[in-house]
Amino acid sequence: MLVLGGGLAGLTAALHLRRLLPEARIAVLERRAGLAPEAIHKVGESTVEIGAHYFGHTLGLESHLRERHLRKFGFRFFSSDRHDSIDDVQEVGVSRYLSVPSYQIDRGIFENHLGEHARSSGIEVVSGAVIEAIDLGTDDALHVVSVRRHDAVERLASRWIIDASGRAGLLKRKLGLAESTGHPTNAVWFRVPVRIDVDDWSKDSQWLERCEHRQRWRSTNHLIGDGYWVWLIPLSSGYHSVGIVADASAHPLDRMNSFARAMDWLRVHQPRLAQALVEADAKPADFAFLRHFSYGCREVFSRDRWAITGEAGVFLDPFYSPGSDFIAIANTYIADLVRRDLAGDRIGPYVTLYSQLFRSFYESTLTLYRGQYGVFAHPGALSIKVIWDYTYYWGVLCQLFFQDRLTDLRMLGRVREDLLSSRALNDAAQPFLRRLAADTPPHNPRVLLDQAALPWFDDLNRSLTIQLDDAGFIERIQASRVLLESLAIEMASRAIKADPSIALWPETIAMLERASDLPTADGQLLAYPLAS
């Protein structure tokens, strides 16, 4: 089989196939010649739980992640728009590490390791390979790929083609599969050869001691304001990645599409970061921007024995770093389809079902971002949204992946109604959060909303480490639905207590209708112990 693209998605797909099919012939065609540089200029440095579990456990790379990359100190959110001081705004994050690790990955180091591992596993990795044409076979006919290398063109035949060509999107372009997400956002980003430590921005010992480890720099730090957020991601090579992601209508790209313009923009919206970059004399090692970076793909798996993974197919939004997650999910389905095909099974029904499942995961995750950038202007609504989104992610999608149930169609059928109920509740919660941010007064208290101090939240994260039998898995998915219902009721109850008219909002009514199985909640899910 041929994998088009030797980056993160392509190499992990090849390694996944090798682990499942040790005798299969696999070749990876990579346009770049030679090794990737450290701190390579790619988005996708921050992983979350599914991606980290996929790399570490599914592919067996945990020791490499621990030794060569940085354990992430979770996500951290500062409502710091137009503030000169980081320690006088709301902070949402953890004061200590939770049970399930995730990592800040230096893509150059990681992709070079993946390439070495692939070669040692008997996978042919061909560098300097430029794809000139793809002729897709149908029925049992082989696909043919024309590849230029060293001024010669070679035609390679393969039963399977897996497109992992990144934003080049070779198959998507060829087959006209592109579709809009309705999420018009832009991004600029650059890397600087210095460590950016937000702890250095404060002299307040009480603020510094909020966290057990003075390692806020290890977090994916989000500096947040109306219609935008800024990322700070550390890399093990000593660089720091800085990015601005913004709603296109609120913050036009032409105001930040060069390093000088980005610095001018930061001086207005995140002055403390701009000051830190100036004080460190931080010269960018690179700079890039993407207009309308979010996109979809109408089809990613085909009964004609081709598939698409990574950015060659879909890209949502980097706010919660889902890129590696969707590589993991797509690769899992692709590997199972290839395995079934090579075993002589009819894959058509599985292609249909896996496509529906992947589409469902993609669409439900998109709701976390689309139309939600206005929530960032409201610290209170933001803090609730973050908790809700985590609960939905850990309680539903993570459970499916960590329990190895993505391809267990029998079990997915048994929990179908609970999954649909959880998705419908999330679909109703996102408009409620949007309305809460738009129509209630914002407050930006000087507090740490410590997610690690919420016992149920800590337990939900820890639950990912516990392997379950069938009965236990069904119970877990049901418990996740009940937890989401309880959280929805508490979100509404707290808002109504502050303003009774919120009970009449259509968004409130719609959300509570989805949580109708629970008439009351104990009111403690959002009861943070506050650290000022």
Task: Show the residue positions of the predicted features.
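Predominantly flavin-linked oxidoreductase catalytic cores and closely associated redox partners
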Residues: 16, 36, 117-273, 331
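N-terminal FAD cofactor-binding segment of flavoenzymes
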Residues: 36-84
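Beta1/beta-strand and adjacent pyrophosphate-binding region of the FAD-binding site
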Residues: 1-9, 27
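Conserved Rossmann-like nucleotide-cofactor binding loop
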Residues: 9, 13, 34
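FAD/FMN-dependent oxidoreductases across multiple families
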Residues: 226-230, 234-236, 250-337, 341-373
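Short beta-strand to alpha-helix junction loop
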Residues: 50, 95-116, 252-257
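Glycine-rich FAD pyrophosphate-binding loop
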Residues: 18-43
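C-terminal helical "tail/cap" subdomain of flavin- and related membrane-associated enzymes
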Residues: 338-532
